[in-house]
Every structure is written in structure tokens, then in C-alpha cells.
């Protein structure tokens, strides 16, 4: 079918910490044609995207020419910063000699490879305070040829000329990527936040380049010649080449996609103002939709201890998900998260073993493991066996391989979900319960109550300024948490396609072009000139 406006499909892919979700979206009929959910492999994000594209393109009759765009939201930038996996960068500070306290704050926040303090900088009016020293920058560049650089000049949002001059010198002398702080300041002042933002951006560039190159190769593999776009923290799409230059803008890409997706799929529920709650395997993101539009943050995106100047939606992220590692010492002593692990219910599927074999291994009682499984399977709070758990029962073997008891195992035990093999979850709940002096079902129920309490507390904190609002829950465990919260106090909706909301958000997002025009005063002849900058 030839359409006058070109290809009819968008592909949206949301690479999360636990799963990679994908959808094939029909832009003409405004519907989801196909969806897919694949476990994320942290060693190779591109592999998860490859598997997603393979499944989605199988739903298209032609060779991919009907796909207009592949839109990707990803937590790669976020995870790299949280895990300290960014590349080190050299830092050039221009005109900061008079402000040692600012330099100290900057160095304390980011720990650059090396620092060069250069004469120069401007005043708050954009007037040159000192003459720029190009020779010092040139010598520094030659000493660090091929390395990454971040350049920050005093009051560069008012006048970026010294930063621009330094960047030209660095590139002319064989440097790697160079980020100037004014490029990510959005015309706002704050020397520390501006410099930290630029430095973090530089540290992410090598990772972004590898990811973009890998994704480009994967797209070609499936005959996709369309653009590959990325979702920014403000939920706007940008070309991959923009992401290559400014990967820091993608730090809230995943939550932005979820919020955009929740807004889109909740439209059919006639909701235009609500709190969107995306509950994943690793974390939960809470955002707000007001009159059909996402609410923005005044402070900018914050990741870990880093406060940046990147425009972002007003999102609260908490370390709570279906796969959060759960430690239990008793029904009143439960710790959920912040670490993520693989639920025990996945052990049989991942290892290729029979569920009964895993249960015997977990409980250390091969003659009676089958009876335990049946006891817990019927939902009874009292297990069939009443004797002590054998001393050989231990989860240590599986924990060493990255597995542990999680809220998902608790939900399986309560028969609120059926993830992996629920029999294994019930056996693990039995084991945990016996060690805590309670029944396995009661133990699971206590974990579920704790998880729900953590979510409720965070939502209450987030909505403290705007009051009670309807809620839209999305993400794989959305239905479970909606049922746990079904007490009549909050209006909770779980819309269709709730489990792939992030991918839907990526698929339906659009390009936005923003320009800022600065009126610059020339102190040499008292004239004024305009300077237009594309910022997105």
C-alpha cells in the first residue's frame, strides 16, 4: 500500500534494566500491531535490540521500507553514571582563578583526569574580563592528544567565545570529543552545575558512540533504512547523531518514554490529568500528566548525586521493582532493594533444570520436597510439613549466581502472578518462612505489603504538592500493585498494553525543535546583535 505521506509504521524500543520491550505501531490506524518483551542482557544492549527488531519486523510483509523510524529509549546513560562507568575527561577552566571555591566544588563533584586553569572569561553582561590564553590550551592539547576534553568558561552562557576558541584549538591538535559547557547550559547560569553537566556528557560519549554504531548495524541487518531516533529526558525525539554528541540528554530517556506511553494508552480511559506509575523489574518511576501534557521539573534531571542542567520531566525514581532483592528476617523485618536480582522462580527456566530438581536443591530434602510444593501451591497459610527445615536447605548456591527472593516470588506464592515457575517461588517462600518462624504464605504476604507500602509512601511524597489524583499503573507488575492498592482510597487504572508502555511512548513520540535567540550587547561599539542557537 503506497501512502502519500510515506511509511506507515514506527518501531518503539524501550531498553530497561530488566526487560527490553518493543512495539510495532501503525501511525495511520493509530494502533499497536505487535509487541515483544525480551530479557535485557547488560553485556550487550544491542543484542536485546537485535532480538526485538527480529520479532517486530517479522510482522511486516515487505522488507522494512514501510518503517518510518526506529525510536529508542534507554537507561544506558543512567546506568553508566550510577555505576561509575563513564570515561575520564580532561577539564579546562577558563577565567576561574578568582573563584577557588567554585573550582573546589567542581573538582569534588567529578574528579577529572587533569585540570588546566586558563586566563580569560567574561562578566555577567558578556563582556570579556580577561584576554583568553590560547597558547596554554594548545600546549595542554598536545600533551593529551587523542583524549577527551571538557571546556568551561566563566559566564559562557552570556558569551561563549572563549569556550569556542578553546574547542577549535583542541580539535586542531588531535583531541577526542570536546564538550563546551555553554552547549548544555540552556542559557542558564550556574558554574558548577553547568561544568558538571558538560563533564558527564563527555564521559558518556564513547559509550554512546558504540551503542549507536551497534544499533545502526542491527537496523541494516533487518533492511531498515529509516532514521534511528532516541528519546531525550524531556520526551522529545532526537537523531542518533545528536545523541552521539549529547548523550547526557538521554539520562531520563526510559522514564520519559514510560510517561509518554502512559499518557497515550490512558487516553482511551478518558483521563487527562493523573499520576503515572511505571513499575518495572528494577525500579519504579512516578510522573504526572496535567491536561494531557507531562509536567516538567524546574531543577533539571538529577541522577545519583549529580544535579544537571538537562531539561527533564518531573519524575521520581525509586529502587523498587518486581526483581528487587528482598532480605527477610521476620514479617516485621523486611528489606526490599535497592539491588536488583533474578527471581528464584526463573532458576529452572534459566538453568534448563526441572522445577522439582530446583525445589529439592533449594530445600535440601529430596524425599519431601514434592509435598512442600503441593502444600504451598494450594494457597494454604499452613505448610504441610511442620518439622524444621533441614540444615542443608540453603539459597546460597543460587544467590551466588545472581538469584534471590524477590517481590515477584512473593506475588507468585500469593497467586497474584505467574512468572517463571510459581512452584519454585512457593518452595522458596516456605523456606524463608520457616527460617523466620512463620508460614510461607504469610511471609509472602508480608513482603507484598512491604512493597505496596514503599510504593504508597513514594506516591504520597510525589503528590504532596498537588493532592490526590487518579493513578495509571503501567509496567509488568502493574496489575499486582493495583490489586494490592485496591482499598477504595485511590482511583487506579491499568490500561491496555500496560506492560509495554515505555515502548509505546518511544513509538508515538515526536521531534521537537527549540531555538533560543540571545540579544548580545557589543561593548566595543555599543551595538546589539542577535545570536540564534538550536537547542533541540
Segments (PLM) and residue ranges:
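N-terminally biased helix-coil "hinge/interface" segments that flank
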Residues: 1-534
Amino acid at each position: 500500500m503506497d501512502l502519500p505521506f510515506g511509511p506507515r509504521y514506527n518501531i518503539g524500543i524501550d531498553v530497561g534494566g530488566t526487560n527490553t520491550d518493543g512495539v510495532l505501531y501503525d501511525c495511520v490506524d493509530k494502533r499497536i500491531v505487535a509487541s515483544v518483551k525480551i530479557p535485557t542482557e547488560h553485556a550487550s544492549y544491542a543484542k536485546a535490540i537485535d532480538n526485538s527488531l527480529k520479532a517486530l519486523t517479522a510482522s511486516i510483509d515487505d522488507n522494512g521500507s514501510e518503517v518510518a523510524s526506529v525510536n529508542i529509549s534507554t537507561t544506558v546513560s543512567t546506568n553508566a553514571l550510577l555505576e561509575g562507568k563513564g570515561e575520564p575527561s580532561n577539564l579546562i577552566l577558563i577565567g576561574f582563578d578568582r573563584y577557588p571555591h567554585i573550582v573546589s566544588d567542581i573538582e569534588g563533584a567529578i574528579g577529572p583526569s587533569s585540570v588546566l586553569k586558563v586566563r580569560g572569561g567574561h562578566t555577567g553582561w558578556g563582556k570579556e574580563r580577561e584576554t583568553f590564553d590560547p597558547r596554554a590550551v594548545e600546549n595542554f592539547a598536545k600533551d593529551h592528544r587523542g583524549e577527551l576534553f571538557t571546556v568551561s568558561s566563566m559566564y559562557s552562557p552570556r558569551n561563549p567565545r572563549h569556550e569556542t576558541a578553546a574547542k577549535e584549538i583542541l580539535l586542531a591538535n588531535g583531541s577526542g570529543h570536546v564538550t563546551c559547557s555553554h552547549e548544555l547550559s540552556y542559557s542558564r547560569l550556574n558554574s558548577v552545575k553547568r561544568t558538571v553537566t558538560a563533564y558527564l556528557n563527555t564521559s558518556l560519549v564513547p559509550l554512546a558512540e558504540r551503542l549507536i554504531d551497534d544499533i545502526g548495524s542491527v537496523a541494516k541487518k533487518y533492511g531498515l533504512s529509516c532514521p534511528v531516533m532516541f528519546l531525550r529526558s524531556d520526551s522529545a525525539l532526537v537523531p542518533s547523531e545528536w545523541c552521539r554528541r549529547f548523550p547526557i540528554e538521554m539520562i531520563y530517556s526510559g522514564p520519559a518514554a514510560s510517561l509518554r506511553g502512559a499518557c497515550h494508552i490512558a487516553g482511551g480511559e478518558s483521563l487527562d490529568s493523573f499520576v503515572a506509575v511505571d513499575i518495572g523489574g528494577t525500579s519504579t518511576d512516578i510522573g504526572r500528566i496535567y491536561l494531557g501534557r507531562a509536567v516538567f521539573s524546574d531543577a533539571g534531571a538529577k541522577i545519583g548525586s549529580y544535579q544537571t542542567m538537562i531539561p527533564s520531566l518531573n519524575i521520581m525514581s525509586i529502587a523498587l521493582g518486581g526483581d528487587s532483592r528482598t532480605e527477610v528476617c521476620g514479617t516485621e523485618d523486611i528489606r526490599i532493594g535497592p539491588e536488583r536480582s533474578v527471581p528464584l522462580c526463573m532458576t529452572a527456566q534459566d538453568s534448563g533444570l526441572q522445577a522439582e530438581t530446583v525445589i529439592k536443591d533449594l530445600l535440601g530434602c529430596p524425599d519431601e520436597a514434592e509435598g512442600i510444593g503441593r502444600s504451598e501451591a494450594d494457597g494454604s497459610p499452613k505448610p504441610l510439613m511442620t518439622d524444621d527445615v533441614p540444615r542443608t536447605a540453603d539459597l546460597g548456591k543460587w544467590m551466588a549466581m545472581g538469584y534471590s527472593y524477590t517481590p515477584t516470588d512473593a506475588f507468585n506464592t500469593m497467586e497474584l502472578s505467574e512468572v517463571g515457575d510459581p512452584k519454585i517461588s512457593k518452595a522458596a517462600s516456605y523456606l524463608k518462612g520457616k527460617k523466620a518462624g512463620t508460614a510461607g504464605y504469610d511471609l509472602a504476604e508480608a513482603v507484598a505489603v512491604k512493597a505496596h507500602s514503599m510504593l504508597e509512601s513514594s506516591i504520597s511524597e510525589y503528590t504532596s504538592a498537588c493532592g490526590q489524583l487518579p493513578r495509571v499503573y503501567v509496567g509488568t507488575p502493574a496489575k499486582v500493585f493495583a490489586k494490592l492498592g485496591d482499598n477504595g482510597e485511590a482511583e487506579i487504572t491499568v490500561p491496555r498494553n500496560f506492560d509495554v508502555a515505555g515502548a509505546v511512548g518511544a513509538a508515538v513520540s515526536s521531534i521537537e525543535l527549540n531555538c533560543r535567540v540571545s540579544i548580545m550587547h557589543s561593548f566595543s561599539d555599543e551595538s546589539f546583535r542577535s545570536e540564534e542557537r538550536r537547542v533541540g
